[in-house]
């Protein structure tokens, strides 16, 4: 079964998309065609959006799901005329919260991410820069400044996890790819030994690793199942031998991996 889903906002659309994606993920038997539409901030744009929604309804022969964080009442009313099932995120959650707090909300779109009022902005940028500078074992002499160091075979999800932790939580995360040479030495690389307390391992199912590597280097030794199976087996053995906490990333999203890593290592988020 297929359904169209729209994430609509008069701001960046991050809130609508994040919450909407999380909710839709609970319905694994349905395939969603997803469309993010930020900055729908005028009557003209709203009317054009209604046409897009109605076109999707006609094409799918079923009304689309709409997640919106629209602040402007006039624009919301226009969207409500579409042939879609609307979930107004702000009104759904803010109304009961206003009642509980005995206070009216400001209904300010994008407030939680405002640069001008967010003292965490520079820390977020510094964390992202750290993740980029210390990606893939490129530099190891700043590991003393890292909050956490992810280790694992190439293409197991280390880089996106580091960037997510940096962007969302201000975590200074480095990552180091364990190579065939490291595995043959049967011990941690020298650059990692003195930072053992910061290490966390990612592993992955060999068949999934094969598929990922095949997209990068098809029909190569690097992407062969035999090579992937060997590397995964050896790196998991290294994790056990060195007592490095680890998780299998195969069936988890970047968000889930990040949360599990922080909990396992007891690393506090710099901001929430």
From Swiss-Prot:
Keyword Transferase assigned? yes
- Sequence positions that bind ADP: 152-159
What superkingdom heads the lineage?
Bacteria
Q: What class of enzyme is it?
A: transferase
Which keywords accompany this UniProt record?
A: Kinase, Nucleotide-binding, Serine/threonine-protein kinase, Transferase
HAMAP family associated with the record: PSRP
Q: Tell me the protein's name.
A: Putative phosphoenolpyruvate synthase regulatory protein
Q: Supply the source organism for this entry.
A: Pseudomonas savastanoi pv. phaseolicola (strain 1448A / Race 6) (Pseudomonas syringae pv. phaseolicola (strain 1448A / Race 6))
């Amino acid at each position: 079964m297929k359904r169209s889903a729209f994430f609509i906002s008069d701001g960046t659309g991050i809130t609508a998309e994040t919450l909407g994606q999380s909710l839709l993920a609970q319905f694994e038997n349905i395939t969603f065609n997803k469309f993010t539409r930020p900055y729908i901030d005028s009557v003209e744009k709203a009317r054009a959006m209604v046409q897009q929604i109605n076109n999707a309804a006609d094409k799918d022969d079923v009304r689309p799901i709409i997640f919106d964080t629209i602040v402007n009442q006039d624009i919301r009313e226009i969207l409500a005329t579409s042939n879609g099932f609307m979930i107004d995120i702000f009104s759904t959650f803010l109304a009961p919260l206003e009642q509980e707090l005995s206070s009216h909300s400001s209904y300010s779109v994008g407030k939680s991410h405002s640069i001008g009022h967010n003292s965490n902005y520079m820390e977020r940028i510094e964390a992202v820069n750290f993740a980029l500078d210390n990606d893939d074992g490129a530099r190891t002499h700043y590991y003393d400044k890292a909050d956490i160091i992810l280790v694992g075979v190439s293409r197991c999800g280390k880089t996106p996890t580091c960037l997510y932790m940096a962007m969302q939580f201000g975590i200074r995360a480095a990552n180091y790819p364990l190579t065939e040479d490291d595995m043959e030495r049967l011990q941690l690389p020298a650059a990692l030994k003195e930072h053992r307390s910061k290490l966390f391992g990612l592993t992955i199912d060999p068949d999934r690793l094969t598929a990922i590597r095949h997209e990068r280097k098809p029909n190569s030794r690097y992407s062969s199942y035999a090579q992937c199976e060997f590397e995964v087996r050896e790196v998991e053995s290294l994790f056990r031998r060195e007592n490095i906490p680890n998780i299998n990333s195969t069936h988890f999203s970047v968000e889930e991996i990040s949360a599990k890593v922080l909990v396992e290592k007891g690393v506090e988020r710099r901001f929430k």
